[in-house]
Amino acid sequence: LKRLLKIISNNKVLVKNFTSLSLLQLANYIFPVITLPYLVRVLGPEKYGLINFAAAFSAYFVIITDYGFNLSATQEISVNRNDKEKVSEIFSSVLTIKIILFFLSSGIFFLIVNMFELFSNDAGLYSIMFIGVVGIVLFPLWVYQGVEKMKYILIINVAIRSVTIVSIFLLVKVENDYLLLAVIYTITQVMTGITGLFFAIRKFDLRYLFPSKVQLLEQLKKGWNLFLSSIWINLYTTSNVFILGLFAPNSVVGYYSAADKVRIAFQGILSSMSQSVFPYVNKLLAESYQKFISFNRKLLKISVMIGIIISSSLFLFAEPIVKIVLGNEYSPSVIVLRIIAWLPLIIFLSNVFGIQTMLPLNYQKKFSQILFLAALINLMISFSIVPSYFEIGTAVSMLVTEIFVTLSFFIFIRMKRIPVI
């Protein structure tokens, strides 16, 4: 107990940010825990699957507009947090690039929706979901993370999501209300983005400094490898739902998506840990390599312990969890949940080896190369088995790919003699 109190005392900022992000993730995952059982029953597997397919499609444009800034800009702001002029310069350059990328994405989006019948048949739904990307473009998560003031994200998200939950229960009543649900999701994202942007400007005394071409190119260069990494990650995460939707009925997409939502809800603590720890480990590394290694060793032990508890619980109790949370109509989700139950443990390890160790040590290129190979493996497996095995094939593909990523990160840091283990 004394040792634990000492660790907390020596890492007050980290503990404070981790607590804020844990509460934020709790709020984020209470949201689906409250609404998921209601929505899967009201919408049914088909419409619920369609909504998730549309969300997976929109996620491609989120990847384009984010451009890896949630890591690269966070890292840069963390190092320069005491220089207000430099932080404003980074803020202005990154926001400008994200807005430009959004307009480029808009052109791509409208071309795809008008050219392919799969999308044009539900053009209204895809358009509504795409508008939500605006909110993600505007929300400067990388600023809050960089200055380690995550409690403000908590306040903004909880306030707006509370209104969203009430709106869903009041307005979404029947299967055909799926478009209304998409509108609610989009309004939530846009409101969060606008509120987060203006609050950050006022709270952190940010100024928009019209960026030069050199500054824009500098930010693009810094985020490039992480942008590629984001694309490769997306090809074996969000793309799984998208690929499944190309071959399977919407109802099958619903079975997989519902099981994955349950897994993500249980895995929520990882996002809190990753977001709060990343700027902290960068700061530690700037102070002392030994402190950096020592901290990541402790982080690894905690990750293994939490991962084993979460994954084994999901595997052992998959059937009652599906029955209680999703209902009898989603019985095919049980086997999916059992297969992907081990993802939390695997991803926890991957996070420590990759994001918290390789990226601070400037191994972005190798990080990106590993994820590129993972994306290729996932695509090969998916297009080989998903057409025949649908949701089971998607789950297997996801599991195999994540195992490959974690093992590759592990082998790399061992080869470089980085003593995290």
Q: What does each model-found stretch correspond to?
A:
Residues 12-70, 106, 165, 225-251, ...:
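Signature of the first transmembrane helix
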Residues 123, 127-130, 154-204, 373-377, ...:
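Hydrophobic alpha-helical transmembrane segments
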Residues 66-82, 263-288, 354-360:
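Helix-loop junctions and terminal segments of transmembrane helices
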Residues 123, 134-156, 344-370:
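Membrane-interface junctions at transmembrane-helix termini in multi-pass inner-membrane proteins
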Residues 1-14, 151, 178-185, 194-237, ...:
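Interhelical loop/hinge segments that connect adjacent transmembrane helices in multipass membrane
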